[in-house]
């Protein structure tokens, strides 16, 4: 077992678990410093590292001034071989966590907590790209978080986290996508009245879409690219890759392709046998699904016999929309 690095720097979204991560690292013997502006990290580390076996530092990134200091810090930690960890979680999970703890959001809540969450995610996207490690805490309890952190600080190889994101071009392109596919040329279920109110998660809609040869060919090309690119991303020790698929609204075509990819890549998530992708951790995010459903509801009215989408905004993600559900 390799020696734990003396320093771990942590950034992340509000509600993603930075405080909990610090607590878990303290139990692993780390001395912690919380809410430190990036410009103060280097002098603090140089002053403290001779007196402390290991340091865990979480950053204060609320102000643009502090975020502008990250490139200098990122270059330094890379030169020192120090892990720079970004903690994140799906937006519905952050919404539930912050609501349950009645915790104010640093980006304000005048326009709503959901908007504050999305504003912070956008603001921290450049910071996220500077990090060396990423950890989605959406489905982790305290013990699992500690295990992940322990694996990181002990240098245990981690799986490549492949985040599959569906989105709607009408709502904007995900700013953190490494690979992006435009599938607006595929048959549009919106123009099929019996499919319009469904989503790409519904078997009936998937059956309609994948009956089309162009859809099948497009899907196979994307799947083949993932399998072909994966060894090269692993070779450069990239721990996180975001693949985004977009259609017009992010409710039908892109969602269906992401769901099928997650299903077909699932066998590769567990190390076994001769699997081509033995250490791939697949995560799914339907970024604009809920936005699109709300728009359809406003245009055509709620589906008879069902509660309005606006009343389901917390329930829907838990029923299978694993990420910032919007269109």
From Swiss-Prot:
InterPro entries: P-loop_NTPase (IPR027417), RapZ-like (IPR005337), RapZ-like_N (IPR053930), RapZ_C (IPR053931). The keyword ATP-binding applies. GO terms for molecular function: ATP binding; GTP binding. Coiled coil: none annotated. Belongs to the RapZ-like family. PANTHER family: RNASE ADAPTER PROTEIN RAPZ. This is Nucleotide-binding protein CYB_0992. The lineage of its organism: Bacteria, Bacillati, Cyanobacteriota, Cyanophyceae, Synechococcales.
């Amino acid at each position: 077992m390799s020696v734990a690095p003396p320093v771990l720097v942590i950034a992340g979204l509000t509600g993603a678990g930075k405080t909990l991560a610090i607590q878990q690292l303290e139990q692993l013997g780390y001395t912690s410093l919380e809410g430190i502006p990036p410009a103060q990290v280097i002098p603090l580390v140089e002053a403290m590292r001779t007196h402390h076996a290991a340091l865990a530092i979480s950053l204060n990134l609320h102000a643009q001034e502090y975020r502008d200091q990250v490139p200098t810090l990122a270059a330094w930690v890379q030169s020192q071989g120090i892990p720079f960890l970004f903690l994140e979680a799906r937006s519905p999970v952050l919404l539930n966590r912050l609501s349950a703890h009645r915790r104010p959001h640093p980006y304000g809540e005048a326009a709503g907590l959901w908007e504050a969450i999305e504003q912070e995610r956008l603001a921290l996207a450049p910071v996220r790209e500077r990090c060396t490690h990423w950890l989605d805490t959406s489905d982790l309890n305290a013990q699992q978080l500690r295990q992940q952190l322990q694996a990181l600080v002990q240098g245990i190889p981690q799986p490549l986290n492949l985040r599959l994101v569906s989105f709607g071009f009408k709502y904007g392109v995900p700013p953190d996508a490494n690979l992006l596919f435009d599938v607006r040329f595929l048959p549009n279920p919106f123009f099929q009245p019996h499919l319009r109110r469904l989503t790409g998660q519904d078997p009936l809609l998937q059956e309609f879409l994948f009956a089309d040869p162009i859809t099948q060919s497009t899907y196979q090309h994307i799947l083949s690219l993932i399998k072909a690119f994966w060894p090269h991303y692993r070779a450069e020790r990239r721990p996180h890759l975001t693949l985004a698929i977009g259609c017009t609204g992010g409710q039908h075509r892109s969602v269906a392709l992401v769901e099928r990819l997650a299903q077909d890549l699932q066998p590769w998530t567990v190390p076994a046998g001769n699997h081509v992708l033995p250490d791939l951790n697949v995560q799914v995010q339907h970024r604009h699904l809920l936005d699109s459903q709300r728009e359809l509801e406003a245009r055509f009215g709620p589906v008879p016999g069902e509660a309005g989408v606006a009343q389901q905004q917390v329930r829907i993600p838990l029923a299978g929309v694993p990420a910032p559900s919007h269109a």
